[in-house]
A protein has these predicted regions:
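Short, Lys/Arg-enriched segments at the junction into DNA-binding effector domains
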Residues: 4, 117-174, 178
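Basic, amphipathic DNA-recognition helix from helix-turn-helix-like DNA-binding domains
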Residues: 68, 72, 77-134
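DNA-binding patch around the recognition helix
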Residues: 130, 155, 198-200, 204-223
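Hydrophobic residue at a beta-alpha junction
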Residues: 35, 58-61, 88
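Two-component/phosphorelay signaling modules centered on CheY-like receiver
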Residues: 11-32
Length: 223
C-alpha cells in the first residue's frame, strides 16, 4: 500500500521510531517529518498526506492549534501524541478534530495498530450496500459516503461519518455505547467512552443538533 504520512514531532528519536515502523509496514510509503508547528502546516499544504501523526508539544504553533487549522480545510485522519496522560488533554484533542490520541512513551506495535485502524476507517464504509438513508431533512448516501442536511453537503471526517452511518442504520433504536465503540473504533476502544462522547458532540455541532432538544441524535443514559 502506498501512503503519504506527515509526522510532526520535535523529538527526533520519536519521529524516527514512527517513520521506521511505517516504512517497515508500508514499504512504498512516503514519510515527511516536521519539527515545528509552522513546518507541519507548510508540509501539510505541500504534501497533502493521507495520514498525520501530530505531537502536542512542539515549537509554535503547538499540536492543538495545528490540528485545528488542518480541520478547517481537511478531513485527513489525525493521530495526536502527548506525554500528558490526562483526560482533559485527550478530550481537547478529540474536540479539535483529532481522530485518535496516544500517550508517550508508546509501544510501536500499538502505534501501528492505531494507524492501521485510522486507515481502515478512512478507506471504507460499514457494510450497508449502496442505499440512501433519510432521517428528517438529513440524507446519507452509503454508496458515495455523502451526507446532506437540507440539501447542503456536510463535511465529516472518516470517523464522524462511520459513527453517523451506524446511527442512521439503526435509526429509532437505542445502541449500547460498547457496541458503537467496537463497530466504529474497534474492540480495543470498548473501555473508553470518551471517544464516543466527544464524537457525538462533534456530530451534533456539524448537524446543528441541540443536545437539549435533539432531532437526530438522542442520548439514553445507562445504555
Amino acid at each position: 500500500m502506498t501512503m503519504k504520512l506527515l509526522v510532526a514531532e520535535d523529538a527526533r528519536d520519536v519521529a524516527e521510531v514512527v517513520a521506521f515502523g511505517v516504512r517497515l509496514t508500508w514499504p512504498d510509503s512516503e514519510v515527511t517529518v516536521a519539527t515545528s508547528g509552522q513546518e507541519a502546516l507548510r508540509q501539510f499544504d505541500e504534501q497533502k498526506p493521507d495520514l498525520v501523526v501530530l505531537d502536542v508539544s512542539m515549537p509554535p504553533p503547538d499540536g492543538f492549534e495545528v490540528c485545528r487549522r488542518i480541520r478547517e480545510t481537511s478531513s485527513v485522519p489525525i493521530l495526536m501524541l502527548t506525554v500528558h496522560d490526562s483526560t482533559a488533554d485527550k478530550v481537547r484533542a478529540l474536540e479539535l478534530g483529532a481522530d485518535d490520541y496516544l500517550t508517550k512513551p508508546f509501544d510501536h506495535l500499538e502505534l501501528l495498530a492505531r494507524l492501521k485502524a485510522l486507515l481502515r476507517r478512512a478507506g471504507g464504509a460499514l457494510p450497508m450496500g449502496g442505499r440512501q438513508y433519510t432521517v428528517g431533512d438529513l440524507t446519507l448516501d452509503a454508496g458515495t459516503r455523502e451526507v446532506r442536511l437540507r440539501g447542503e453537503a456536510v463535511k465529516l471526517t472518516s470517523t464522524e461519518y462511520r459513527l453517523l452511518e451506524e446511527l442512521v442504520r439503526h435509526a429509532g433504536s437505542a445502541l449500547p455505547h460498547q457496541y458503537l465503540l467496537e463497530r466504529v473504533w474497534g474492540p480495543e476502544y470498548v473501555g473508553d467512552p470518551s471517544y464516543l462522547k466527544v464524537f457525538v458532540r462533534r456530530l451534533r455541532q456539524k448537524l446543528g443538533d441541540d443536545a437539549e432538544r435533539p432531532r437526530y441524535i438522542q442520548t439514553e443514559w445507562g445504555v
